[in-house]
Regions:
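ABC-family P-loop ATPase nucleotide-binding domain
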Residues: 1-21, 232-258
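H-loop (His-switch) and adjacent beta-strand-loop-beta switch element
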Residues: 222-235
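ABC family nucleotide-binding domain
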Residues: 11-225
Length: 258
């Protein structure tokens, strides 16, 4: 989206003067200090920084998982920093999907059951949610792994289940916290191309947290985080990796052959 167009459109996510303080023993540690940012609909954004920079704390606060000491967080016109925990739970169910570094799959559930969980929480009937879960798993290259439990799958396959779960309810906003941190290089590329392709095809906003500049290269915009502040913002559109239908088909085919 061009800069002049953005001035006419309200951001999907707007953060203003965000500050977060943790108390460790008798010491107060400022994890975030006066952070401001705007993320627009359909953008793929990366929060890039080293361990302890504050990037995951910023993501957690935008997801409503932590409360700020100061500042505001507005998502799709709603001030989530003012919401009660109950309202936040309902808001996340309606608008957000999550991809975790550690996958966070239920070990006693198979792939279909894990993927259909967000739909179950939303009250969707079993037949409908399992149909959607199957379709999403096929899209993620797991057509042959639908009945497998997490212990029966590789790390890459588990993360594909995690991605399917994050996208199955078609949330407007997806957060991915170090989504490839436990994966090898080849699987990392496959996972990133799949996740970015799905977000673009479904016109979703994707926010990725990473310490890896290669992962950041998939984003439209990169926020460099240092010591709890945004040190710089990089427009990456001219350099980003584009994923075409041919490449996406190859990724799925490779996954199916495993």
């Amino acid at each position: 989206m061009a800069q002049d167009e953005k001035t006419k459109v309200k951001p999907a996510v707007s953060v203003r003067d965000l500050t977060k303080i943790f108390v460790i023993g008798k010491e107060k540690v400022k994890a975030l200090s006066g952070v401001n940012l705007d993320i627009y609909e359909n953008e793929i954004v990366c929060l890039l920084g080293t361990s302890g920079s504050g990037k995951s704390t910023l993501l957690n606060m935008m997801a409503g998982l932590e409360k700020p000491a100061k500042g505001s967080i507005t998502i799709f016109g709603h001030r989530i920093d003012k919401m009660s925990e109950r309202k936040l739970v309902l808001f996340r169910q309606k608008y957000m999907g999550f991809v975790f570094q550690a996958y966070n799959l239920m070990p006693n559930l198979n792939a279909i059951e894990n993927v259909s969980m967000p739909l179950a929480f939303a009250g969707e009937k079993r037949k409908s949610r399992e149909k959607k879960a199957r379709e999403m798993l096929k899209l993620c290259g797991l057509g042959k792994r639908m009945k497998h439990k997490p212990t029966q799958m590789s790390g890459g396959q588990q993360q594909r289940v995690g991605i399917a779960r994050a996208f199955v309810a078609k949330p407007k906003l997806v957060f991915a916290d170090e989504p490839t941190g436990n994966l090898d290089t080849r699987t990392t590329i496959e996972i990133m191309e799949m996740m970015v392709s799905m977000a673009r095809q479904n016109h979703q906003t994707l926010v990725i947290v990473t310490h890896d500049v290669e992962i950041a290269s998939y984003a439209d915009k990169i926020y460099h985080i240092i010591d709890g502040t945004i040190s710089s913002v990089e427009d990456n559109r001219s350099k980003q990796i584009a994923v075409g239908s041919k490449e996406a088909a190859q990724i799925v085919a490779a996954a199916e052959s495993v």
